[in-house]
Amino acid sequence: AKGTAGGAKLRAFVSDVDTPGYKRPENPNHFALVIGIEKYSGLPQADYAERDASAVHRHLLAMGYPERNVILLTGKDAGRAGIEKYVESWLPRNVAVDSKVLIYFSGHGAPSAESGQAYLVPWDGDPQFLETTGYPLKRLYEKLGQLKVRDIVVAMDACFSGAGGRSVIAQGTRPLVSKADVDVSG
């Protein structure tokens, strides 16, 4: 696979860690939402985010997550409506008390200049209008906290500071730092 970063041509190589060499028995109580957004509708791309999400997807299947219980959202499918649908409707309808839930996000993150809240930037997100186009981290944690499940893991490969390659903050600006204060202990 080939891509560009900062105008330079890059070659992506698939490593042996990208392909699981194991297979565990299927567990019907394992659920995952895997989101990888590399090419945005109006933003710089987040290099390798979709490839990373696909690797996580393959590993989850090998770890016993049933394919019907693992949602992989990439590209246009990873818009705000898609993220909302799976976090706020699909998970609550499908998980049970003994379920394990994993949320993986690889893409852009950004803090709102107005509220200081951190947002996941969906495929159709606009960093200048995060309150209406982004997906707030606080909301994600609140929705996950409402699930009556045993275990929840959230893993993110996104920069919210403006200092890294997965942030949409203009270089040289000072972002506001937010703290999610949500009790998810049940």
Regions found by a protein language model. Give the residues of each.
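Second-shell loop/turn segments in exported
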Residues: 21-22, 39-47, 71-77, 124-131
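Functional beta-strand-loop-alpha-helix junction segments that form "active/interaction loops"
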Residues: 3-19, 53, 57-99, 131-132, ...
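Short, surface-exposed alpha-helical segments at coil->helix boundaries
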Residues: 46, 50-54
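Active-site-proximal C-terminal subdomain of hydrolase catalytic domains
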Residues: 36, 60, 74, 149-186
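Terminal peptide-recognition signature
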Residues: 36, 56, 103
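Caspase-like (clan CD) cysteine peptidase catalytic core
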Residues: 29, 80-106, 110-169
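Disordered regulatory segments flanking catalytic cores
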Residues: 1-47, 62, 146-149, 166-171
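Short glycine-/polar-rich loops that comprise or flank the Walker A/P-loop
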Residues: 29-30, 66-69, 149-151, 185-186
